[in-house]
């Protein structure tokens, strides 16, 4: 009897367990709602059952007037079946979802425009609210899709989007959830499908790291979230069926990369796990099986980073979630990198292996970034941390960007028309087309009148040299103030010849220029650039000059030409190439400089048959160019940033005095209340400041970085980028820096220097170059400090030379002992200060050679 009772109790227990499971499963299922709008049937899509909103359903009720259904046979996406119908409304429409338990829910709204009888989907406009939270405002679905395709086209990808899914995360109390669709007055709206999916509370943490700051509380209990982007970095697109917990879609990252070949895809599908078991809802393991890491073969400047660029709505807070999984290295300190979000350092010294506790373990990091009202772009960038000894590489597996609600709003204020352009832009285009047409008519008649006058003048007068005039050149206007170098520009437009009496020096005739260059003989060409050619010339009195003749058709060259004129008309210094004069006859644009007899510094280092420079000559050349740069940075109120410091822009005169040249890319420094100048990245590969490249923020420290590359180039005598060398030697800055950090720079110096330099001077020289190449500008010295240090290095070397020659009046060890621990440098040396004063008073140009 006891056995029978025991068996009975076992059966009863099994039945209770079964019913407990069924009830629990039913409650879990009741948390999710899948609605096929405009349909009266149930449809199986992505392994889930979607119920038509016309089917009897106590959990979902539909309230609204004049709501109609529409259907189509089109569709090829995973959701094609539920996109065949839609709910169309021209009055307020409410969907009420009953039986909601307290917690967080993904609300996904599906839109797929198609032809609807008596309605033009291109003109639909409506708003959506969820329990008082505004999700969308006067949205035009066709315009949103067209705008997405425009972005894809701009990045060179196929524009194939035909539908739109808006995903929101909403904190909801127990009871019900009401979604309200409100058409704009006189318009209508539509929706194809709605899904409400319960979300684990562990998906988002309340406390996150603010970019550039400390831990902050998100306050998610009272805020809604919109998913802006969700990417499977380095891997294929993952549809909802690949993310069975939350049925999310993970796009590929290629269309958002700034430079696609900056990163390569890596994959490892074996034994991938979560670092923490609770992280399973965060992302499917498939996301962690692939990644993108920095490319060593396609990107010459390995210090640069992988960058992704995203269009966002201004004036919102954004939660950036980055997914990582170390797939290759098998111990700590092998891959260490930095994370940058919108030009700020979010994390430094980031080691995936250390954070995850091993290889093949998926982790994620959250960062909060407030985007200002003036910014509509969010940058995500990863780059190696040069301050540590790990490999120069970075890796990312996944990326998500979430917008946080502000004052009960998630809707963006920018509206797009059916072409994908903002409504304000469309209106302005119509206005400008009308205005442009009127202006074109006026210009036509003005041009016609000018043409008649010119033809009449041509009949009366012919120029002997008209046959040599270059075509297509436009007059050059300058915006400069010719009173003092420190005075602010007035913005007045001055033609070149109006500057002759002030800062531009002598005005040459075209006949004089032709005579000096033997009619622009190519045999006298000594340089060429985007602006045109540079010729060696000789005046009647035997004075040698350099003549820069601009190419009429080069707009880029023209802009640089104008910049150089503005800069040189304000600058006078012994270590800057001097402007002698100009010529603007017959629409020519010609500048005349002092002739630098010994050419570029690079030509004396490698690539020519010229005799190599001694160590002392190289130091003196570096000191001279440093003096010129120091003057640029400090010689005026805002200073000037050269932006193209390299050995081909350092010229040597007949006495090997070094002078900076080529100011076509130069930029005025930041004003007193700013720390940098925001500008597009320009410069020469191999010399570019990586921080400037990442943030597009220019400072004088960018010149310091480039000068650090010059220092290594001067001592190693090789190209800064040489793709024919082994990978670790391609980039001179990285290669030399690695040897310098080992305190073994002498192993890679120019063989012509061996035995002819002071070891102590080389050691100090290497330390200066290393400081110049610090990854962050704030850790680099000022150019004045670099100048002082180089002068000190020269003293050490000269003391060594005297000792070698038997002169013991001053030893290199004494020089080391006398060096101060810290130092400051006045704005200019005595010799240069007089030149600065002369520049500021706008006195006549003199030849400083």
Swiss-Prot record:
Subcellular location: Cell membrane
A biological process term (GO) from this entry: unidimensional cell growth
Covalent S-S links between cysteines: none
Polar residues bias locations: 827-849
Swiss-Prot/TrEMBL keywords: ATP-binding, Cell membrane, Glycoprotein, Kinase, Membrane, Nucleotide-binding, Serine/threonine-protein kinase, Signal, Transferase, Transmembrane, Transmembrane helix
GO CC aspect terms: plasma membrane
Region described as Disordered: spans on this chain: 810-849
Glycosylated residues (UniProt): 40, 57, 94, 122, 158, 268, 271, 305, 343
Keyword Ribonucleoprotein among record annotations: no
EC number: 2.7.11.-
Chief place where the protein resides: membrane
Superkingdom of source: Eukaryota
Domain Protein kinase residue range list: 520-793
Keyword Membrane: yes
Residues of the active site: 644 (proton acceptor)
Matches recorded under PROSITE patterns: PROTEIN_KINASE_ATP, PROTEIN_KINASE_DOM, PROTEIN_KINASE_ST
Signal peptide segment: 1-28
Cytoplasmic side: 451-849
Membrane-spanning segments: 430-450
Protein name: Probable receptor-like protein kinase At1g30570
Organism of origin: Arabidopsis thaliana
Taxon lineage: Eukaryota, Viridiplantae, Streptophyta, Embryophyta, Tracheophyta
């Amino acid at each position: 009897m006891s056995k029978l009772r025991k068996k009975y109790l076992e059966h009863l227990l099994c039945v209770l367990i079964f019913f407990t499971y069924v009830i629990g499963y039913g409650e879990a299922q009741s948390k999710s709602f899948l609605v096929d709008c405009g349909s009266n049937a149930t449809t199986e899509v992505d392994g889930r059952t979607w119920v038509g909103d016309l089917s009897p359903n106590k959990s979902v009720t539909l309230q609204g007037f004049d709501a109609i259904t529409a259907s189509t046979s089109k569709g090829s996406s995973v959701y094609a079946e539920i996109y065949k119908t839609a709910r169309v409304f021209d009055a307020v429409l409410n969907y009420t979802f009953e039986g909601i338990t307290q917690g967080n829910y993904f609300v996904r709204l599906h839109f797929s425009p198609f032809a609807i009888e008596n309605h033009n989907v291109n003109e639909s406009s409506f708003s959506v609210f969820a329990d008082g939270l505004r999700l969308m405002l006067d949205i035009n679905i066709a315009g949103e899709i067209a705008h997405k395709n425009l972005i894809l086209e701009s990045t060179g990808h196929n524009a194939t989007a035909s539908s739109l899914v808006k995903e929101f995360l909403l904190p909801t109390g127990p009871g019900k959830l009401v979604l309200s669709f409100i058409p704009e007055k006189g318009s209508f709206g539509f929706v194809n499908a709605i899904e409400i999916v319960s979300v684990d509370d562990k998906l988002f943490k309340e406390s996150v790291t603010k970019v550039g700051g400390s831990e902050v509380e998100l306050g998610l209990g009272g805020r809604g979230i919109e998913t802006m982007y969700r990417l499977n970095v380095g891997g294929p697109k993952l549809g909802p069926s690949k993310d069975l917990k939350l049925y999310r879609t993970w796009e590929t990252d290629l269309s958002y990369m700034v430079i696609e070949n900056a990163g390569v895809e890596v994959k490892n599908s074996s034994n991938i796990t979560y670092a923490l078991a609770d992280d399973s809802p965060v992302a499917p393991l498939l996301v962690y099986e692939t990644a993108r890491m920095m490319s060593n073969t396609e990107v010459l400047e390995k210090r640069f980073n992988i960058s992704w660029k995203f269009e966002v709505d201004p004036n919102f807070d954004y939660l950036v979630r980055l997914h990582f999984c170390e797939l290759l290295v098998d111990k700590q300190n092998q891959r260490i990198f930095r994370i940058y979000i919108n030009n700020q350092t979010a994390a430094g010294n980031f080691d995936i292996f250390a954070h995850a506790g091993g290889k093949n373990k998926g982790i994620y990091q959250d960062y909060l970034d407030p985007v200002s009202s003036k910014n509509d772009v969010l940058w995500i960038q990863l780059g190696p941390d040069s301050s540590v000894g790990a490999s120069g590489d970075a890796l990312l597996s996944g990326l998500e960007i979430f917008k946080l609600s502000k004052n009960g709003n998630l809707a963006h204020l920018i509206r797009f028309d059916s072409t994908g352009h903002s409504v304000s832009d469309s209106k302005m285009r119509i206005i400008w087309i009308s205005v442009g047409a009127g202006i074109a008519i006026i210009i036509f008649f003005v041009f016609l009148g000018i043409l008649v006058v010119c033809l009449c003048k041509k009949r009366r007068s012919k120029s002997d040299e008209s046959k040599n005039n270059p075509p297509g050149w436009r007059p050059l206007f300058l915006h400069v103030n010719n009173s003092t170098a420190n005075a602010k520009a007035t913005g007045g437009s001055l033609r070149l010849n109006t500057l002759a009496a002030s800062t531009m020096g002598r005005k040459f005739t075209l006949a004089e220029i032709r005579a000096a260059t033997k009619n622009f003989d190519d045999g006298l060409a000594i340089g060429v650039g985007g602006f045109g050619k540079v010729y060696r010339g000789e005046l009647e009195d035997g004075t040698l000059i350099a003549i820069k003749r601009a190419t009429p058709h080069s707009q880029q060259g023209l802009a640089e030409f104008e910049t150089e004129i503005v800069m040189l008309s304000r600058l006078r210094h012994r270590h800057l190439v001097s402007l002698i004069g100009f010529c603007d006859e017959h629409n020519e644009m010609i500048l005349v400089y002092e002739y630098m007899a010994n050419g570029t510094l690079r030509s004396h280092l490698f690539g020519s048959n010229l005799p190599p420079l001694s160590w002392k000559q190289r130091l003196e050349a570096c000191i001279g160019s440093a003096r010129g740069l120091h003057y640029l940075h400090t010689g005026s109120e805002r200073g000037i940033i050269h932006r193209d410091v390299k050995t081909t822009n350092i010229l040597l005169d007949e006495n090997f005095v070094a002078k900076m040249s080529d100011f076509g890319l130069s930029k005025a420094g930041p004003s007193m209340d700013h720390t940098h100048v925001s500008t597009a990245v320009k410069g020469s590969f191999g010399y570019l400041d990586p921080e400037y490249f990442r943030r597009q923020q220019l400072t004088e420290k960018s010149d310091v970085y480039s000068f650090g590359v010059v220092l290594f180039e001067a001592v190693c005598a090789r190209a800064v980028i040489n793709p024919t060398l082994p990978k670790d030697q391609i980039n001179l800055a990285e290669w030399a820096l690695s040897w310098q950090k080992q305190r073994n720079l002498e192993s890679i110096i120019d063989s012509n220097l061996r035995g002819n330099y002071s070891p102590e001077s080389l050691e100090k020289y290497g330390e200066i170059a290393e400081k110049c190449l610090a990854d962050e500008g704030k850790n680099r010295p000022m150019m004045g400090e670099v100048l002082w240090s180089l002068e000190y290095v020269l003293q050490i070397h000269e003391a060594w030379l005297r000792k070698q020659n038997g002169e013991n009046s001053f030893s290199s060890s004494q020089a080391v002992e006398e060096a101060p621990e810290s130092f400051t440098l006045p704005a200019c040396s005595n010799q240069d200060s007089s030149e600065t004063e002369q520049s500021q008073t706008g006195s006549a140009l003199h030849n400083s050679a």
